[in-house]
Design a protein with these regions (language model features):
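A solvent-exposed, acidic/Ser-Thr-rich amphipathic alpha-helical stretch
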Residues: 13, 31-82
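Residue-level signal for tight coil/turn positions that link beta-strands
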Residues: 82-85, 107
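Short, low-complexity N-terminal intrinsically disordered segments enriched in polar/charged residues
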Residues: 1-40
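Short, surface-exposed coil-to-beta transition loops
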Residues: 72-74, 94-99
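Acidic surface patches and DE-rich sequence motifs
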Residues: 46, 92, 105
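Short beta-strand edge/turn micro-motifs at domain boundaries
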Residues: 97-121
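Short beta-strand segments that buttress and anchor functional surface loops
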Residues: 86-93
Length: 121
């Protein structure tokens, strides 16, 4: 699950950190940094289906960031934590809501295992 990708990026010490890190890295055009927020076999929902695993998630973010969009932080909700799993959610400024499942890694950091970036909006 966890690998050396996080050594060159800040690691999430709380599940809520992942949303902030996403906005920072997306606005910086840091595709590798975005991919580092996910477990190696994570699932990312897309308008056309889903991306599974590091390579497909990387391709999805390369496509998304090609036009250099700007991301605005939303209202991060407190994580709902049960053991090594956490449900995270953010209400975006356009009214859309994101929902993610994060998993605590063996070193205590958190990575997304499932990401549904837009369920309303």
């Amino acid at each position: 699950m966890h690998d050396d990708r996080l050594r060159r990026h800040e690691a999430a010490t709380a599940p809520e950190d992942l949303g902030r890190m996403f906005v920072e890295r997306a606005n910086a055009g840091d595709v590798a940094g975005l991919v580092a927020l996910y477990e190696a076999d994570a699932v990312l929902a897309l308008p056309t289906g889903q991306a599974t695993g590091t390579q497909q998630i990387r391709q999805a973010y390369e496509h998304l960031l090609a036009d250099k969009p700007t991301f605005t932080p939303g209202e991060q909700q407190p994580a709902l934590v049960n053991g090594d799993l956490a449900l995270t959610s953010t209400r975006l400024t356009d009214g859309a809501v994101t929902v993610e499942v994060a998993r605590r890694q063996p070193d205590g950091t958190w990575l997304w295992a499932v990401d549904q970036p837009n369920i309303l909006g």
